[in-house]
Amino acid sequence: MGYVGVKGGKDAILNAEELVEYYRCRKGGTPLKVSQIEDQMRLLIDKIISEGSLYSPRVSAIALKQTEGDPMEASYLVRAFRSTVPRTCFSIPVKSEEMFLIRRISSSFQNIPWGQVIGPSRDYAQRLIRFELEDETEFSVDPPKKHDESELDEPVEKVVDYLRKQGLMQNPQKDPEQKPYDITRQPITFPLDRSARLQRLTRGEDGAVLAFGYASLRGWGSVHPTIAEVRVGYLPVKILHPYWKTPVTVGKVMVTEVESICSFSKTTDPTTGEESYMFTLGYGLVFGHNERKAIAMSILDRALCAEHPTSPIEDQEFVLYHIDNMESQGFISHLKLPHYVSFQSALDRIRSIAAKRNETATDASEEKEHV
Amino acid sequence: MNPLLSVHNLKKIYGEGCDDCMGPSPRPGPDNLCPICGSIIACTDVTFDVYPGEVLGIVGESGSGKSTVLGCINLTTPVNGGEILYSRLQSGIRNILEVDAQTRRTLQNIHFGIVYQNPHLGLNFSISGEGNVAERMLVADSRNFAAIQEKVHNLFERVELSSARFKDYPINYSGGMQQRVQIAKALINAPSLILLDEPTGGLDVSVQAKILDLIRSISRELNVAMIMVSHDIQVIRLLCKRIIVMKHGRIIESGLTDRVIDDPQQAYTQTLVHSTIQ
Amino acid sequence: MYNFALLDENSKREIRRSVLKAIAIPGFQVPFASRELPIFYGWGTGGLQITLSLIGKDEILKVFDQGDDDSVNAVNLKRLIQLTTGVEVTSDTQSATLLQTRHRIPEQTLTSDQVLVLQVPMPEPLRKVESRETETARMHAEKDYGKMFVKLYEDVLHHGEITLSSDYPVLVFDRHLMATTPIPRWDVPKLDQAENLFLFGAGREKKIYAVPPYTDVEPLSLEDYAFRVEDFSNKQCVFCKSTESYLNEIPSPEGAGQIYACSDTDFCQKNRNQ
């Protein structure tokens, strides 16, 4: 008789955890400082903030350290932490014109009011590995002259508003009575309204948002936008003062905002009934500095507005059910769990069917013999 | 004799519609568009009766609204006006445009059967031919495999489907066989009305003749009422005692088939008759 | 650092409301705003959210995975619940008040003061025949389950048998078709007219549903192809010699189907102690 395990292994699980700790620090050396991760892994931290949907660079940095740099696992930790924190109040809507910009470009017009601000961007860099970084020390670092991060600190008119003034861009359909959906507190049922779709998208996994957006751009969908504006900067977080009921700024968050100009369509003004041709808008907004995700999100926002979906990317259920990192990695990983019982049940079926087949085959051959 | 089905002032508009085309007797134009708002008038002011056991023909060119009428009766196309009275529901004569979802499915599944020109509309290509027909009985709460299978096989023999092909998937059937399976599917729950939407449209002539022959013998044998839609007046003449001629979404002429074909009143009907029968 | 039973109180209350609704409409999947937990989605977060929302300080908890109290998933969940609540944990089915399970119902019959919480990966029984949520919602609303019976018919037609193995669909209270999580067919009859309450949680798919005590639960079947549980005739557990429990096959050099052991480890242990 072969090896027969009686029970699963609680001890083994505890040992596995110790082993993980060993691997995390296996080469000895100085443990990474959380503050270093936070400061020097800026874009990675931003990804975790965005997918974890909790604006805390510090918590994200700890999570990243704990998970040996696995961003998916780290953002999972952040989301789980988020579930333990009570919601004490809501921030009130802010206008993104109020953003303190560190970067702002437009691909639709060369000369825009306040100009194009390239800011910190690798868009034009050569993708060459800089081997000298291997020998970088705190003394050899040559920090560039300190920039004032908030170069533009007064409201800057948006390119889409410029188009709106000319009647060329759809106005947002605002219903002041309607509260935005909250996908962390309300069940998701399809069809989802736009505010809920945008929330699913902005929490979506970087790579998944990118892949779906790319598919639309390549022809599995019909959105091929011109970017009105990419804005990176800090937005104020405002709440209503609990006593005075007046807006108070309590902090700021870095975000990337993208407005895409998409194909034009015939629209009827709901109030005047006038018909006109107007561009449609695709909107992307993500926590942190992540331009490709925000652009892809703007494509998906537009694609999911399709009234009669013809491609998977225009299908709400297809895109929004499969874009979340927590749901996809969790379910894929669960395949590693024991499935002994259900597999035993499947074995029972396949053997029973095979036995039945054999019976029929034997019957048939016996009949033949009789003949 | 009381009618099985009475259609009154049926209207279907594609587009936004306006007061004129949404109202009774909209202004006619040179085509099936509303001359005021440009919406498509798929059908309007369509009124007719169907009697138990009769085969009624609807003829007209493509875009005349004949298939729309079938879709409205089968409750798959939402209408913009009118009523459809049906006499065989347990609750008596009912306007079937106003029934709840469950009654709607009972009507579609048990009381009516439909055969489409395009087999992809009528058959589920992911299950066997036999499963397609069995589905209708299963939906009607039959739960005995052997009993269902026997009934399906009998019907397959009646529509002359070769027994070696019962378990095949629709994709492997010829066009004629697909229509035979659709006919079996329409018949399985002994409906009181069968809707035939150009059932022999895409078939070659010899197969077409066999299928028409089958439909004719079934209608006599089972005494089931049928509405047959076709652009081909020959097909209609073969099967139908009464005929309706449609153009631009409206009924322009109706009557006994022999009368309409021998003595067409409308210019359009005359063209239709003379262009197809020499 | 963390609240009792991890989740904040408002979230727990919200989940309890969904549980109440689920009990009121047996077999109906109540959508809820599922939270992310320190356990992966797909690893029992639905069951865990129900357990965390219901658990009180006096509860005696049993968590088991595939019948095994010591299996990885069960150990994980148990440690988390214990860490955040400090409740007493047992492997004894009889003395537990709140039981959370992955894919098994205990061999020992549960009583009216026990609640069994089941972890559900795929709550939608119609997903096998329809991939779209909006369409399955309509099918449930209209009790339009014809497609599911067609699946059974096609099974018999092509294979001579119903091929559904675990996660066997059942009709609850003669109204809603319900997925059985995948428990094996062996456990399905235990749902019918049971003394205890069954709660089902699907975290990733964000649904909660329930079978209240003394509710009719009927496995889907055709009249002449009746529902049948797994066949373990002429087989027995290698440890406790039981012939009346769900057995897991143990691959061995002697060949397939030779050695079996109880899937329910508590049941097996008690049998051996007797």
Question: Which residues does each predicted region cover?
Answer:
Chain B
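Conserved ABC ATPase "signature" region
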Residues: 26-28, 146-164
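Helix-to-loop junction immediately C-terminal to a conserved catalytic motif
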Residues: 74
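ABC ATPase NBD Q-loop/coupling interface
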Residues: 83-106
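Conserved ABC ATPase signature
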Residues: 169-173, 177
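A short, surface-exposed alpha-helical micro-motif characterized by mixed small hydrophobic
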Residues: 236-238
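ABC ATPase "signature
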Residues: 254-255
